[in-house]
Every structure is written in C-alpha cells, then in structure tokens.
C-alpha cells in the first residue's frame, strides 16, 4: 500500500507526466541484450529441492488489512483481503527484484503486517542469498516496496530521483541514510526519469500517480507474453482492468493516475498480464515452488 504519503501529498511542486509511449532507450552491453530472454518451452518450475530455476516469481512476505472498496452504483461497502508481494526474475546469474519488501520488524509492526517473514529468509530457502541479487527496480519509496533494500548490498538500484530523495527522509530500516549513501558512492544507483529501456524488451515507465516518482515496469518475456508490474497504481488486477481502483487511497497526481489506468486498460485488451503487489488472486497454490514463492506462468 501507500504507507508513507502524508508529507508527499503536501508537496507543492508538480512533477510533469511523461507519455508512456515515449520510451527512451538505454545502451546496454551485448551480455545484457540477452539477459531476460526466456525460453518459452523450458519448464520454469523447479525440480531441485534447493535451487530456484530461471523464471518469474511472486514472493509473498506478509498479509495486510482488508481494503474498503466503495461503489456508488451499489449499496454497502465491500472489503477485500490484501497481501504484500514483490517479484523476482532469475535468468542465469542475474537475479532482478521488482521492489524489495520490508526487512525491519519495527517497520513491519508499525504498519500492521500479519504473517510476515523477512524477504531474506524466504529467498534463502530457495538458495538465493542477499548478495546474489544483482538488480532491484523500486517502483516507489513506500516502506512495503523499498523497505528491504538493506538486504541486498550488491544490487544496482533503479528508481526515479524524486522518490529516491523521499526515501532518504524515511527510517524504513536501520542505518538507512548510510546504506543509501553507499549505493550512491559505489555507483550502484541508476536514476530513471520518463521511460527507460533497461534491458531489451524490459522498460521502466514513469507513472507519477501514487507518488511523485512512481514507476511501473513493462516486460515482453517472449512473443505474445507481456507483463506489466503496476506498483501501487493498481491494487486489484480485475478492478483496474475495468478502469476502477479502490477509492480513498492517497494520490500525488489524480491526473497521472487516471492516465495510467487508461493505459493499463489498453494493455489488458491487448493480452498483457497485469501484476500488482497486493492482490491475493495472483497467488495460486499449485504454483508455490518454495514456501511463499510462486511461479508466474
């Protein structure tokens, strides 16, 4: 959820919305050009008890409160369960996370997460140590998305500069400012403004609805298999696909958010799979390959 936006909503500057269709290409090495090319014929599950195979996975690190949904066309109010997720892409020696979860017990307690497990504990059971994570895309600065960054010291971080500055003002985990400074000093930080193709067919999109620097990620896994990681611009996939979103959640820019939802609707019509970070319907028991780790077909 958007866990820390009271002071964001009071900001007086307006961050301009970049057109989602205007991607700015990033030069990459030849090694990077093939790093996220999946083989659609390969079984992306795992036959090993101790090792996660190449593929896309949702990591479920906690449960949240019921989110109240209101619809003016209906009587009464509906409440939907929420979960807390981040995503992992494994391709050979490259392990990329989209968001990082929450590492701090104090932060977890502050925001009332239930059935919480540290992201590092979950990943280690699948044979992934924190030092093995090579890249992290942060969709925005909120605790449940950026609050586990300290667990992955070697990872290069991709984030919008506005949300990086907001992240510096938080206390999501111990020694936060020192850790962020180390990322800057070690040049393990890439700022993303507008749209940026980080790897071939894998681009970060500025959305700017929930927070000033909110981003989404669009990835063409292979022909006819495109996914969109929506961050917190969309909470429940089915609602957003129909042009709706839970009322009452804080927004930095209503205009930007609505434009993104319209774009999302278009992608759904074209067959794109929408992945959100709080929708329990994305977790299928038969796809749980390790405890709390779910394969995304």
For the regions a protein language model found, what residue spans apply to each?
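C-terminal motif of bacterial Sec signal peptides marking the signal peptidase cleavage site
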Residues: 24-25
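N-terminal secretory signal peptides that target proteins for export/translocation
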Residues: 1-9
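Conserved beta-strand hairpin/beta-sheet module of binuclear metal-dependent hydrolase folds
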Residues: 63-121, 216-233
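Metallo-beta-lactamase
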Residues: 39-47, 103, 117-128, 132, 161-206, 212-288, ...
């Amino acid at each position: 959820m958007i866990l820390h936006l009271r002071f964001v909503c009071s900001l007086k500057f307006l961050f301009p919305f970049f057109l989602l269709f205007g991607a700015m290409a990033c030069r990459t090495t030849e090694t990077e050009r093939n790093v996220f090319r999946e083989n659609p014929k390969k079984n992306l599950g795992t036959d090993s008890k101790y090792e996660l195979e190449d593929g896309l996975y949702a990591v479920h690190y906690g449960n949240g409160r019921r989110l109240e949904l209101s619809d003016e066309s209906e009587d009464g109010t509906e409440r939907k369960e929420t979960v807390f997720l981040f995503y992992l892409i494994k391709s050979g020696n490259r392990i990329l996370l989209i968001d990082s979860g929450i590492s701090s017990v104090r932060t977890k307690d502050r925001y009332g997460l239930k059935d919480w497990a540290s992201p590092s504990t979950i990943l280690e059971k699948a044979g992934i140590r924190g030092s093995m994570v090579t890249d992290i895309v942060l969709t925005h600065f909120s605790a449940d998305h950026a609050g586990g960054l300290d667990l992955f010291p070697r990872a290069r971080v991709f984030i919008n500069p506005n949300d990086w500055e907001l992240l510096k003002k938080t206390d999501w985990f111990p020694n936060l400012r020192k850790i962020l400074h180390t990322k800057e000093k070690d040049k393990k930080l890439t700022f993303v403004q507008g749209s940026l193709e980080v790897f071939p067919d894998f681009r970060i999109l500025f959305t700017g609805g929930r927070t000033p620097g909110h981003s989404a990620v669009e990835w063409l896994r292979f022909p006819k298999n495109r996914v969109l990681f929506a961050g917190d611009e969309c909470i429940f996939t089915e609602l957003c696909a129909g042009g709706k979103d839970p009322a009452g959640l804080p927004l930095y820019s209503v205009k930007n958010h609505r434009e993104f939802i319209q774009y999302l609707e278009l992608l759904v019509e074209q067959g794109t799979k929408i992945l959100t970070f709080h929708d329990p319907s994305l977790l299928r028991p038969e796809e749980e390959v390790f405890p709390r780790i779910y394969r995304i077909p």
